[in-house]
């Protein structure tokens, strides 16, 4: 059995962790019930007849700990549930997405088959190293800690900002959506991800200091549009880690919605222990705690993204 096959078999092993019963958690939140905006409903999307011409979406914020990885994994899983063929790319040296999908220990540290390996081996083909998650229709490429060296490794390369775009090109006709979990920086990796993408989702914690960094993210996106990818679009700002019981969360959400009224997703992601529990279990929250508010929120976000045209 080859290395790739061994990693896949480890991944698909069922977790023994189970969610606790009768969880006390936030209910599903939207801008309608939190801010009093008009309620928007999104119909269940029809399945696409065949994959192809994938929409590439970067999940970006230059601040860490705002829910990028949680969003990439669980939005991807929710899209797969409605028949979309989804590929996740772990583009962060912390490899949190890889861990959240069940790869741990020695397999996590192995460079061979990771996105870092693919970026550095011109003869390697991305399609040869795609791993299957426990969710049908949800595939992924592992991250690796050596991604932290990208800035120095690619400094002298010509057209270095196009490396990921070229790597993804052969698999665009095999998927409907490709989600890239970006590193919390505005360096070479993020530039590569944005250059390869059609759209951007910006998760933003409902905390005041997170608002201050939002303008920096938007400036980075504007620079990419001016220099390497004029078609790049902001698909939406996603409020995360919302706590209904605190006035601060509501005040921050009001501020974001006032500043960017056309860009804020109607769906809000509330804070819940289910997200951290599902990461430990190595599966998306939609599989770990299917009836939880976290699962419901990401399923609603998937419908909203499709309705907005961000995904087909």
Task: Describe every region a protein language model picked out.
Residues 1-312:
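P-loop NTP-binding core
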